[in-house]
Amino acid sequence: MAGLAATTALPETAVAPVVAERQASMKAMADAAKTISGIFDGKLAYDSAAFKAAAETIRRRSGKAMVDGFPAGSLGDPSAAKAEIEQSREEFNALAGHLESLAAALSSAADDAPDGITEAMRMAPGMAMGSSLLGKRAGGAAEAAPSKMPAEHLFHLILQDCTNCHAKFREKRQ
C-alpha cells in the first residue's frame, strides 16, 4: 500500500513545475503585449529593440514551446488549463503555431522601422478585424500572409488569438 501511495503522489509533484513554467510563460507574453500596446498607443516611446524583444518573447513562447507547455496530465487543477485541450489537441496546436507566425512577422517589422512607427506599420482606417479562429474569415477566405500585414494589425490578431484560446481552453477563475 505504501508503494501505491508513493506512485500516486509522483505525477502530482512532476506536474507542478510544468504548470509553474507555463504560468510564467503566459505572464511574460502578457507583459510583452503590454509593452507593444503601450508603444502603439503612444504611452511608451518607440524603441525598435524593445518592440522586437517583446514580439520575440511572444514568438519564442508560442508554437512548439506553447504546445510542449501543456502536456497530457498537466491540465485542470491546479492550473486554469481546461482538459479540453487534450480533446482538441490539433486545434490547440494550430492556434499555437498561428500565434508564432504572427509574432515572427511582428518581430521582423521592428527591423524595418528602426527609428519609429511608420505609416506602413499602422492599420489602415476601416481595416477589418473580422478574423476568426486561425485566420479563417466568413465565406472561407483566409487572411493575408502575416508578412504582408501592417504590424498593428498583426498585434491585434495576436491579441485575438490569445482571446480565442483563453475562451476555449482556459477555465475562468475568481
Whereabouts are the PLM-identified features?
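Short, surface-exposed loop/turn segments at secondary-structure junctions
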Residues: 42-51
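N-terminal signal peptide c-region/cleavage motif recognized by signal peptidases
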Residues: 6-9
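Bacterial N-terminal signal peptides
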Residues: 1-4
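Sequence context surrounding c-type heme c attachment/ligation sites in exported
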Residues: 12-43, 56, 61-174
